[in-house]
Amino acid sequence: MFIGSGILLNALLLGVMTSFIVVTSPTVFKTLDEEHSKNFLRFIFPRLFNFCFLISTLMFLFFALAEFSFGMVVGIAISISFLINTYFLTPRINKMRDLMLTGHVESEKQFKKLHFASVLLYLLSMVFIVSIFIVYYSRLFSL
């Protein structure tokens, strides 16, 4: 029961993250002007990351109860990555973006580095989520 709940949360997390990439982001940039898209993204990203943190933490707990070690380790790594994105990277990205808009030359390089780190963490989390499925189902079918 616990392992099934963890796998279900893993699927939910992958769905939430994928829908943001496939639906939300492209829609924002196609329908909103720069000012409104900036405001929307600054509002949505912390909430997205916190929601994903909640799901991944619950996933970790269910994997812990099921004694699925791989899921536990990966689940906690994913949870930590969302905390890093929410409380470390996002505020700095926003600050560098604001400085860029005022003409601060050095801030563009820093913005790109921080944004790249944020996207990389997000995509690595998705890879880790898929790896949980692979490990779980390969164990299941090898029994």
Model-derived regions: residue spans:
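Polytopic transmembrane helical bundles with strong interfacial aromatic enrichment
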Residues: 1-143
